[in-house]
From Swiss-Prot:
Residues 28-38, 92-108, 161-490, 536-549, 596-609 are cytoplasmic. One of its GO terms (cellular component) is plasma membrane. The chain crosses the membrane at residues 7-27, 39-59, 71-91, 109-129, 140-160, 491-511, 515-535, 550-570, 575-595, 610-630. It holds the Pfam family Mem_trans. This is Auxin efflux carrier component 2. Its main location: membrane. It comes from Oryza sativa subsp. japonica. InterPro entries: Auxin_eff_plant, Auxin_Efflux_Carrier, Mem_transp_PIN-like. Plants over-expressing PIN2 exhibit reduced height, increased tiller number and enlarged tiller angle. Residues 325-335 have a biased composition (Pro residues).
C-alpha cells in the first residue's frame, strides 16, 4: 500500500530536478540572464562533458554480472514488437499509396518508435525509480541505459541514415538509375546524410550497366585546361551552396558516364538561364565531338519555375580538327541542326565516342550557375581510333539506361530545344526517363495538365540492392558514432565495469575524483540545459494540440501497455513488473529529439513531447505508482 510518506520521498527526489529546469527557464524567458549564444555554450558543455561523464559514472559502478536478463528481455521485446508493428503498418500503407491512396511515411515510423519506446531513463528514471522502489530499481535503470546507448540509439541512427539515403537517391537519381547502383563511396569529410550539408553524387556507369557513385560535399571549383586536342576540364561556378558539376571524360574507353551532381539544399530562386549564353562546340580530329548541351526549360515564366534542368549530349559529325573556339561560344540558334544521316551514316565515327550526360536538378542552389557556366570539351583524339566498344553497339543503338542522341533543332514557340532520336534506338524513352521538368520527388503531370497523386514518384522510386544500401548506412552510422562522446563514455564504462567487478579492481582515487566532480553536476546540468531549451522555444506546444495529444497518448499509454504485455509474457511479476511499467511511462528522452532535429524528422512533435511531457510526467508516473501499488 502506497502511503503519504512514499509520495513525499518521490517528490523529494524529483522536485530538485524541476527546480533546476525552471531556474534555467526563468533565466532566459523572464530575467534575461543568458543570451542564446551563452545557452548554446552551456548546452555544448552538457553534451560533451556533463552527460557523458554522468553515463560513465552510472555504467561503471553497475555490476554487469548481476544484470536481470529477464527484465532486459522484456524491455527489448517491447521495442521489437513496436518496431515490427510499425514496419508492417508502414509497408501496408506504402503499398496502398502506390495504388493512389493515402501516404505513408518512414518519418512517422521513426517518430512513433521514438515516442513509444525511448524514455528519459538516465536523467529522470534513475532518481525517480530509486525513490519509488529502492536502490535495486536504480540498478535496473542503469542496465536500460546501457542497452539504450549501445543498441537502441544506434538503431535510431541506422533508421535516420536509411531515411537520408533514400532521400538522396530519390532526389539525385532518375528512377531507372537507382536500382542499378552497385556501390557507394563516401568522402571522408561527409559525416551524415541528414540533409543539413550540401552533397553531390558523382556517378559512373560501367560496361555492365551498373552505376558506381561517389558522395562528396559540394564545393566550388573552377578548373581549366588547355592544349589543342587534349581533353579539357569543364568550368562550373556554384551559386549559393557552391557545387562543382563539371562533366568529365572517363579514363575508361567506351564507358558511358552519368555525372549526376546536385545539392540537397533548396534553390533560392528559379533558374532563368539563356541557352545561348553557354553553348559551345569543340571539334576533334576525325571524330564526332561531344558537347554538354542544355535542354531549355519549359517556355514561359511558368515553365521556368519547374524543377529540372537537363544537359544532354549532342553529337556533331565533323571533318578536320579545328582549334576550339574561346568562350563565349556561338549561338545555337544560328547553328544548323545535324541531320539524322550524319549521325547514323556509314562515314560517322559516332560509335567510337564517349557519351556524356549531366543531370542537374534546379532544386539545387547550384543548378542555375551550372547551366550558365558548364562547358564540356571533347576527349583526346585517342578515342577516335579506338574500336567500337561493347557498351556502344555498332549501328548507333544506345544501351538501355544510358544517354541517347539529342540534337538542337529549330526552336518551338516556348524556346525549347527539340529532342531528336536520330538513331531510332531504345533511347527514345530518354525524355520520359529524364523529364525536362520536374524531379523524382514530383509526381508526373497528366496530359490534361493536372498532377497525379502526390508521392507516387517517391513511392515507386526503386532503391539499390539491400547489401549496397546496408553498407552505405553502416558507413554513415559508424562516422556518427565515433564523433559522439556518449559512445565512448558508455563503452569505456561498460568495459571498466566488466574488468573491475571481475577482478575486484578499484579505480584510482585521482581519476575517480576527477570524474565525480563533473558527473555529480551532470544530473542538475542536464535538467538546467533542458530548461534553457524550453525557454528558447517559441511555444511549449509547437505541433498543434491534436498532434500533441496524440503524442502524449503514445508516450504515456502505448509504451506502458506494450511493456506490460511483454513483461507478463516473459514472466515478470510483482515489483519487477511495476518497475517495467513505470519506467515506460517516463517523459520523452532527449536524445531522440536531438536526432529528430538534426535529421528534420518531426522535430516539433519530439520537442513538444520533451517539454510538455516533462511537465506532466511527474503526476502521471505518480499515478501509475499509486495504481500499481493498490
Amino acid at each position: 500500500m502506497i502511503t503519504g510518506r512514499d509520495i513525499y520521498d518521490v517528490l523529494a527526489a524529483i522536485v530538485p530536478l524541476y527546480v533546476a529546469m525552471f531556474l534555467a527557464y526563468g533565466s532566459v524567458r523572464w530575467w534575461g540572464i543568458f543570451t542564446p549564444d551563452q545557452c548554446s555554450g552551456i548546452n555544448r558543455f552538457v553534451a560533451v562533458f556533463a552527460v557523458p561523464l554522468l553515463s560513465f559514472h552510472f555504467i561503471s559502478t553497475n555490476d554487469p554480472y548481476s544484470m536481470n536478463y529477464r527484465f532486459l528481455a522484456a524491455d527489448s521485446l517491447q521495442k521489437l514488437v513496436i518496431l515490427a508493428a510499425l514496419a508492417v503498418w508502414h509497408n501496408l500503407l506504402s503499398r496502398y499509396r502506390r495504388n493512389g491512396g493515402a501516404a505513408a511515411s518512414l518519418d512517422w515510423t521513426i517518430t512513433l518508435f521514438s515516442l513509444s519506446t525511448l524514455p528519459n531513463t538516465l536523467v529522470m528514471g534513475i532518481p525517480l525509480l530509486r525513490a519509488m522502489y529502492g536502490d535495486f530499481s536504480g540498478s535496473l535503470m542503469v542496465q536500460i541505459v546501457v542497452l539504450q546507448s549501445v543498441i537502441w540509439y544506434t538503431l535510431m541512427l541506422f533508421l535516420f541514415e536509411y531515411r537520408g539515403a533514400k532521400a538522396l537517391i530519390s532526389e539525385q537519381f532518375p528512377p531507372d538509375v537507382g536500382a542499378s547502383i552497385a556501390s557507394f563511396r563516401v568522402d571522408s569529410d561527409v559525416v551524415s546524410l541528414n540533409g543539413r550539408e550540401a552533397l553531390q553524387a558523382d556517378a559512373e556507369v560501367g560496361r555492365d550497366g551498373r552505376v558506381h557513385v561517389v558522395i562528396r560535399r559540394s564545393a566550388s571549383a573552377s578548373t581549366t585546361g588547355g592544349g589543342g586536342g587534349a581533353a579539357r576540364s569543364g568550368v562550373s561556378r556554384a551559386y549559393g551552396a557552391s557545387n562543382a558539376m563539371t562533366p568529365r571524360a572517363s579514363n575508361l574507353t567506351g564507358v558511358e558516364i552519368y555525372s549526376l551532381q546536385t545539392s540537397r539544399e533548396p534553390t533560392p530562386r528559379a533558374s532563368s538561364f539563356n541557352q545561348a549564353d553557354f553553348y559551345a562546340m569543340f571539334s576533334g580530329s576525325k571524330m564526332a565531338s561531344q558537347m554538354a548541351s542544355p535542354m531549355a526549360q519549359h517556355g514561359g515564366a511558368g515553365g521556368r519555375a519547374q524543377g529540372l534542368d537537363e544537359q544532354v549530349t549532342n553529337k556533331f559529325a565533323s571533318g578536320k580538327a579545328a582549334d576550339p573556339p574561346s568562350y563565349p561560344a556561338p549561338n545555337p540558334g544560328m547553328m544548323p541542326a545535324p541531320r539524322k544521316k550524319e549521325l547514323g551514316g556509314s562515314n560517322s565515327n559516332s560509335n567510337k565516342e564517349l557519351h556524356m550526360f549531366v543531370w542537374s536538378s534546379s532544386a539545387s542552389p547550384v543548378s542555375e550557375a551550372n547551366l550558365r557556366n558548364a562547358v564540356n570539351h571533347a576527349a583526346s583524339t585517342d578515342f577516335a581510333s579506338a574500336p567500337p566498344p561493347a557498351a556502344v553497339p555498332v549501328g548507333g543503338a544506345t544501351p538501355k539506361g544510358v544517354s541517347g542522341s539529342v540534337t538542337p533543332a529549330a526552336k518551338n514557340g516556348g524556346g525549347e530545344l527539340e529532342i531528336e532520336d536520330g538513331l531510332k534506338s531504345p533511347a527514345a524513352g530518354l525524355a520520359a526517363k529524364f523529364p525536362v521538368s520536374g524531379s523524382p520527388y514530383v509526381a508526373p503531370r497528366k496530359k490534361g495538365g493536372g498532377a497525379d497523386v502526390p508521392g507516387l514518384a517517391e513511392a515507386a522510386h526503386p532503391m539499390p540492392p539491400t547489401s549496397v544500401m546496408t553498407r552505405l548506412i553502416l558507413i554513415m552510422v559508424w562516422r556518427k558514432l565515433i564523433r559522439n562522446p556518449n559512445t565512448y563514455s558508455s563503452l569505456i564504462g561498460l568495459v571498466w565495469s566488466l574488468v573491475s567487478f571481475r577482478w575486484n579492481i578499484q579505480m584510482p582515487s585521482i581519476i575517480k575524483g576527477s570524474i565525480s566532480i563533473l558527473s555529480d553536476a551532470g544530473l542538475g546540468m542536464a535538467m538546467f540545459s533542458l530548461g534553457l531549451f524550453m525557454a528558447l522555444q517559441p511555444k511549449i506546444i509547437s505541433c498543434g494540440k491534436t498532434v500533441a495529444t496524440f503524442a502524449m497518448a503514445v508516450r504515456f499509454l502505448t509504451g506502458p501497455a506494450v511493456i506490460a504485455a511483454t513483461s507478463i509474457a516473459i514472466g515478470l511479476r510483482g515489483v519487477l513488473l511495476h518497475v517495467a511499467i513505470v519506467q515506460a511511462a517516463l517523459p520523452q528522452g532527449i536524445v531522440p529529439f536531438v536526432f529528430a532535429k538534426e535529421y528534420n524528422c518531426h522535430p516539433q512533435i519530439l520537442s513538444t513531447a520533451v517539454i510538455f511531457g516533462m511537465l506532466i510526467a511527474l503526476p502521471i508516473t505518480i499515478l501509475y505508482y499509486v495504481l500499481l501499488g493498490i
